[in-house]
Regions:
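Hydrophobic alpha-helical signal peptides and transmembrane signal-/tail-anchor segments
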Residues: 8-17
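N-terminal Rossmann-like NAD(P)+-binding subdomain of aldehyde/semialdehyde dehydrogenases
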Residues: 18-124
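ALDH superfamily catalytic-core signature
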Residues: 23, 140, 147-158, 184, ...
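Short, well-ordered beta-strand elements within core beta-sheets of diverse protein domains
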Residues: 34-40, 277-279, 334-343, 358-363
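C-terminal core of ALDH-fold dehydrogenases
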Residues: 48, 289, 345, 349-435
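Rossmann-like NAD(P) dinucleotide-binding subdomain of oxidoreductase/dehydrogenase enzymes
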Residues: 104, 113-254
């Protein structure tokens, strides 16, 4: 009887997996077919879809908030992900405004990137075109559903989305509004699809060669590592940010205080938030002043021995801890950071090279030569001088919304706006020429 039971369970599991595989294949085929139609949809029509979607978010905000409340009810309020998951009326208005901003941007398609006439009379044009189908894997951030769709649609790309299970209800409600907006403007609704929030669905997307043209993971280091190690489709790495700010021997304390506070506390759950403050040993006496604004935000500091000694009587005891090796490579995504004392800019650069993630780094100094030295030698997508890393954002860079912050070197790097979501093809015009 036990053997028969095991066989039954095995067959049932196999059947469920088979059904999932067939369903996913149907989705990928439909989206791929729809992507070819979307590539030739007029920009005015794409903009109309986005305007309709923004209107729906404002008009049906209660539907989104109700779905979001069901997701929030399953999550611990103390979790660092709670803030990322939470929607409210203000955030919905921001989402609608961001979608309208995307609609107002120039189309990134059909731009002539280069044009030349060869000696044989052939006319070459390098023209921007969509990727085709973009797959995006992300965690508990329902706003990403709207961000990704609006950018994909505006850039002529279809999209397959795989959100985290924590935001399942919110994502379903968001995709329902997206499909309504597409249908009302005569655009095939299958240009955007939400996959089930299962590990199997993620694996299928990452291996959908021939259907998904590029995959973009948005989340923490574990998610990005999993996608990079598992995917057979091309991947653009985004998201994970172990971010440092170096306070140089010639740094201005007041600037440093403001920059450190803003970079660390403006929004702790985003990838551009400060994770490690590095201070020149010649400015050790200024560490309490640099850190004092953080106490009001209950920021826990993991300090090395030198920093701990000077903060011991100048920072709340319950918020001060001894750093370990692991402290420096941690993306905290919380009210916490590491603190390291170094002997000069070169040691700061070495520390960043060892523990950073090539995302965003900053130097606070009044010495221009030191600033340029730091900017040239630090390997990161964005390197700041006397400004907080919180500015690493597509909107702040004037790119409109972004699909993520790319930390790789091949392909897009830094905030990925509309232009970074296109590729190109060569158009070659001739008049009967043949190659000798």
């Amino acid at each position: 009887m036990d053997k028969e039971c095991h066989i039954y369970v095995f067959l049932l599991t196999f059947l469920k997996l088979y059904v999932l595989v067939m369903d996913m294949r149907d989705i990928f085929q439909s989206v791929k077919a729809a992507s070819r139609k979307l590539a030739i949809v007029a920009d005015a029509t794409r903009n109309a879809v986005l305007e309709t979607l923004a209107d729906k978010i404002e008009a049906k905000g209660d539907v989104l908030l109700d779905a979001n409340s069901r997701d929030l009810a399953r999550m611990d309020r103390k979790s660092a992900l709670y803030d990322r998951l939470q929607l409210n009326k203000g955030r919905l208005m921001d989402i609608a405004r961001s979608i309208r901003e995307v609609a107002s941007l120039p189309s990134p398609l059909g731009r002539i990137l280069m044009e030349r006439t060869l000696a044989n009379g052939l006319v070459l044009r390098k023209v921007s075109v969509p990727f085709g189908v973009i797959g995006v894997v992300y965690e508990a951030r329902p706003n990403v559903t709207f961000d990704v769709f609006s950018l994909c649609l505006k850039s002529g790309n279809a999209c397959v989305l795989k959100g985290g299970s924590d935001a399942e209800e919110s994502n379903k409600a968001a995709m329902s509004l997206i499909h309504e907006a597409l249908k009302e403007n005569g655009v095939d609704a299958t240009v955007a699809e939400m996959l089930p929030s299962t590990h199997e669905a993620t694996s299928m997307m990452l291996n959908a060669v021939g259907f998904v043209d590029v995959c973009i993971p948005r989340g923490g280091r574990k998610l990005i590592d999993f996608v990079r190690e598992t995917a057979q489709v091309p991947v653009i790495e985004t998201g994970a940010g172990v971010v440092s700010t170096y306070f140089d021997s010639k740094g201005d304390v007041e600037k440093g205080r403001r920059i450190v506070e803003n970079a660390k506390t403006r929004r702790v759950s985003v990838c551009n938030a400060l994770d490690c403050l590095i201070v020149d040993s010649n400015r050790l006496a200024d560490v309490p002043s640099l850190c004092s604004p953080l106490a009001g935000h209950n920021v826990r500091i993991y300090a090395d021995d030198k920093a701990f000694a000077i903060l011991e009587n100048n920072y709340p005891t319950e918020l001060l801890c001894h750093a370990t090796v692991d402290s420096y490579g941690t993306e905290f995504m919380d009210y916490a950071m590491a603190l390291k004392i170094v002997d000069g800019v070169d040691e700061a650069i070495e520390h960043i090279a060892e523990y950073g993630s090539c995302h965003s780094e900053s130097i606070v100094t009044e010495d221009k030569d030191t600033a340029r030295y730091f900017q040239q030698r630090v390997d990161a997508a964005c390197v700041y001088w006397n400004a907080p890393t919180s500015f690493t954002d597509g909107g702040q860079f004037g790119l409109g919304a972004e699909i993520g912050i790319s930390t790789q070197k091949l392909g897009p790097r830094g905030p990925m706006g509309l232009e970074e979501m296109t590729t190109y093809k060569w158009l070659v015009d001739g008049n009967g020429q043949v190659r000798p």
